Amino acid sequence: MADSAQVPTLVYLVTGGCGFLGEHIVRMLLEREPRLRELRVFDLHLSSWLEELKAGPVQVTAIQGDVTQAHEVAAAMSGSHVVIHTAGLVDVFGKASPKTIHKVNVQGTQNVIDACVQTGTQYLVYTSSMEVVGPNIKGHPFYRGNEDTPYEAVHSHPYPCSKALAEQLVLEANGRKVNGGLPLVTCALRPTGIYGEGHQVMRDFYYQGLRFGGRLFRAVPASVEHGRVYVGNVAWMHILVARELEQRAALMGGQVYFCYDKSPYKSYEDFNMEFLSPCGLRLIGAHPLLPYWLLVLLATLNALLQWLLRPLVLYTPLLNPYTLAMANTTFTVSTNKAQRHFGYKPLFSWEESRTRTIQWVQAMEGSAR
């Protein structure tokens, strides 16, 4: 790829390109990858904003398809140089069955790998998750850890299990011969909690606060820190990895990287208030309003109700044993591996990330300001 610098000859495929992260990757590729000739956006549901991108100098090809269908993935990939595989089913609330989560996240990833081999596509970047590592079901904290920090990654929930299996498939595929005899070069990126424009959970918290008269109620101790990362910096890291994989294949191939930036370490709720407070919302309580034992009881009851009601109705409460453990377990990352391996530096400062996210929240219909 290096010989074609500044010459628009490359074809990229982005799976899940209409999702939260996928959209940011697509838009940033068009802005910051001068070698791009064609950008293929593959998703189960295509978004209307894709049409506005087709007026630019890069050919944007929208492909409606399903990663669980191997022939659709292979057809979309044929002739591509690089694949950024961000398609996946993110579900920690029980909206999808464990079988469906596995089919999309694990079998879908296997289909992408097989399509790389079949079509001779040599470079694969996979969007993994911090949840491949933790927090684990035992509630062990991960404090300022990096990619080599020992940690007991024990999961029982279908989502982190599926992401761990998919990541393993991607890393094990590194070096596999693709059609034409060249080696497949793969790596995986593990974002911590992503935030920014388009984040559905942030949107849900905002409207929840509006329904409660501009108030949110503390449920997690302020001392429980979480690592968060701005979506624009996650997208930027994906683009840098895709750009550098050829020249640094021996170093980067088969590697995992946490996605990180300069966002501050705070509790999940206190971090969200960095954006929601300027939009008129208040967080009530210096300490959790309900004792932890009661939250555990409620989460367990919700899980039981979900199991009992499953034959009749889909019951998907926000509070369940997994989400409670996630919210109440410190998980923060401190690493410079991406900088050392391929020169990553955050494209957006914390101040820029915060401002852009606040402006997005303020633009929502029904703003409390």
Swiss-Prot record:
Its EC number is 1.1.1.-, 1.1.1.181. One of its GO terms (molecular function) is cholest-5-ene-3-beta,7-alpha-diol 3-beta-dehydrogenase activity. CDD domains: 3b-HSD_HSDB1_like_SDR_e (cd09811). It is a multi-pass membrane protein. The chain crosses the membrane at residues 289-309, 312-334. Pathway: Lipid metabolism; steroid biosynthesis. Predominantly expressed in liver. This is 3 beta-hydroxysteroid dehydrogenase type 7. It comes from Mus musculus. The lineage of its organism: Eukaryota, Metazoa, Chordata, Craniata, Vertebrata.
